[in-house]
Amino acid sequence: MNFKRMTDLDLAGKRVLIREDLNVPVKDGKVTSDARIRASLPTIEHALKAGAKVMLMSHLGRPTEGEYAEEFSLQPVADHLGGLLGRDVPLVKDWLGGVEVADGQVVLCENVRFNQGEKKDDEALSQKMAALCDIYVMDAFGTAHRAQASTHGVGKFAPVACAGPLLANELDALGKALDAPAKPLVAIVGGSKVSTKLEVLESLSDKVDQLVVGGGIANTFLAAAGHPVGKSLYEKDLIPAAQKIAEKVHIPIPVDVVTAKAFSESAEAATKKVEDVADDDMILDVGPQTAHIVAALMKEAKTIIWNGPVGVFEFDQFGEGTREMALAIADSDAFSIAGGGDTLAAVDKYGITDKVSYISTGGGAFLEFVEGKVLPAVAMLEARAKD
């Protein structure tokens, strides 16, 4: 992938418009989880140190487009960001007509979704945004799969369009894992439904040496292999698709599972062989034998792509499979990349954040990239790199 990088450009005295992903949870006017804000700090600090006039933009939540609503205001984000940077970060409400900002200073533009035409990638809106800056920086990987005015359109019209460090690092890591991976390449795909991950599974089946499936997805593969799944979550209509994938790539089917009679935090867990699953059982995790087999694969791997837990790890009695796998990834010498909301929660829960080579900040964008889809924001940056 060839794109301009913000870190290679002279930013001194330039009007730099940076699209970050600052879509964080807010409760009672306070940010409750600031991981995305912290992830954007190196980009912002680099631009400030370089003496740029820094304008930040982001969306927050899903307001009615074109209408101001206080509950979706970025004011709490501006306050929190100011605390982290140790400086005032003014929030600019009406910013499309122009923004006053001095060299080495930063402002945050109010929620991009308050502008009519943002989601439709409106050309007139994109041109207004582009007129604000000398350099446009796309740094929000989490929204790179959406062609919107602040993530895509503005980049077509800005004098210069480049990738910020967060986006560039993300693309470098994904490229390393998918374009020319060290082998063996092992992918773990968990989650509740095959239907939502079918394209990912099909795309990976052509690239990986081992494909580990977990969660409800594994139940469909178990059923496809002729095993009983009781009243577990699985998709009967996708059994043929699962069988087709299993013919193309090695999928270690669980040999033992952890079951319960009900889906609840207090449900009693029972470990049993796959052939012993009863009609009223729900499979909620892989068993210890299966976890050992998967852990051994992690040891052999040179590249690991992880998306989705292998069990209902939110309930501790059904979290052992995901825990053992997470620790095996942490101990592995492989280049490992983890992405997707539930995956990041598991990485966090088992304390392996600094043991995973790269943690992807994008959920949908991560999956679409793994599927081999073209991300509109990335395509735009590649096109602008030729200017």
Swiss-Prot record:
GO terms for biological process: gluconeogenesis; glycolytic process. Keywords: ATP-binding, Cytoplasm, Glycolysis, Kinase, Nucleotide-binding, Transferase. Gene3D superfamilies: Phosphoglycerate kinase, N-terminal domain. Pathway: Carbohydrate degradation; glycolysis; pyruvate from D-glyceraldehyde 3-phosphate: step 2/5. Its EC number is 2.7.2.3. It is found in: Cytoplasm. InterPro entries: Phosphoglycerate_kinase (IPR001576), Phosphoglycerate_kinase_CS (IPR015911), Phosphoglycerate_kinase_N (IPR015824), Phosphoglycerate_kinase_sf (IPR036043). This is Phosphoglycerate kinase. Substrate binds at D21, L22, N23, R36, H59, L60, G61, R62, R113, R146. GO terms for molecular function: ADP binding; ATP binding; phosphoglycerate kinase activity. It comes from Alcanivorax borkumensis (strain ATCC 700651 / DSM 11573 / NCIMB 13689 / SK2).
